[in-house]
Amino acid sequence: GLDAVAAGGVAVAGVVSAGRRAVLFTGQGSQRVGMGRELYDRFGVFAESFDRVCGLIDGELPGSLRDVVWSGGSPGALDRTVFAQAGLFAVEVALWELLRSWGVRADFFAGHSVGEVTAAYAAGMLSLEDACTLVAARGRLMQALPAGGVMAAVAASEADVCLVIEVTGAAVDVAAVNGPAAVVVSGAADEVEMVVATCRGRGWRTRSLAVSHAFHSRLMEPMLDGFRAVVAGLDWRVPAVPVVSNVSGAMADPLELVDPEYWVRHVRQPVRFADGV
C-alpha cells in the first residue's frame, strides 16, 4: 500500500470492469495559493483550460485571477469569495479537462456548493462562457454583502443542531449537512455564538470556519434577486450526465436543474452533501 507508493512502486494492480464512476468537485474552503501550478507547468491541456477560464472571467473580477491563484495577490485575496469561487472553478475545469484527455468518463457528477457549478458545466448544462458568467456573478454579489456573517462546524446530528437552534431562538441556519455528525451552521456572529456555546455546553466539538460571509443562510437573501437576473439570462441545457443535487441530496431531475430558480435556491438552502454521497 503506502510503502509501495513511497518506494515508487505499484500500489494497486489489476483491472476492474464493474461499478460506475462519480466525479465530485469541491467547494469553497479548499482553495490555497498556488493550487494547480505544478499541473499547469506539466500538462498542456490543464494549462490551456485554466488560461481559457481566466480569459473569460477576468473582465468580471476586480483583478487578475491567475495572479491571485498563483501568488495570492494582496494578503488574503484568494480567501475573498469573489476570487475563491472563481479560482476553484478555474482549477476544477482544468482538472476535469485533463482527466477527459486521459479517457476518464463520469457516470455521475456532484459538487459541494459552488462545486456544483463545475458539475453543471462538466455535465453539459452550460457553455464555459455561461458558467464563467454564473461563477463571477455569484462571487461578486456575495462579496458585496455586508461583512459580519460567520459559519461554524458542529460534531452533532442535524436533528440535534436544529433543536439547539430552536431552544436558543437564534437567527441561525443549517448551511450544510456533511455527515451523520457533521453539520455547519451559518448566520450573524453573535447569533452563531449562542448556538456554538450551547453545543459546547452539551459536549459537542465545534470549530469556526475561515469564511468571509455566512453562506447558505438568510444573510444571502439580499443578493438573490440580482443573482436570479443573471442565471435567468443564461442558456441552460439538460445534462448529458446525471447530476446529484446539493439542494435535495438526491439525483436531480434534469428539468429542475435547467430552471434558473434552482440555482437561486442553491445559494440559500443547505448543502445536503451527506445525502448526496
Language-model features: locations:
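Helix-enriched interaction subdomains in cytosolic or periplasmic regions
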Residues: 1-6
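Acyltransferase
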Residues: 70-277
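Short, surface-exposed "cap/lid" segments of acyl-processing enzymes
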Residues: 17-48, 52
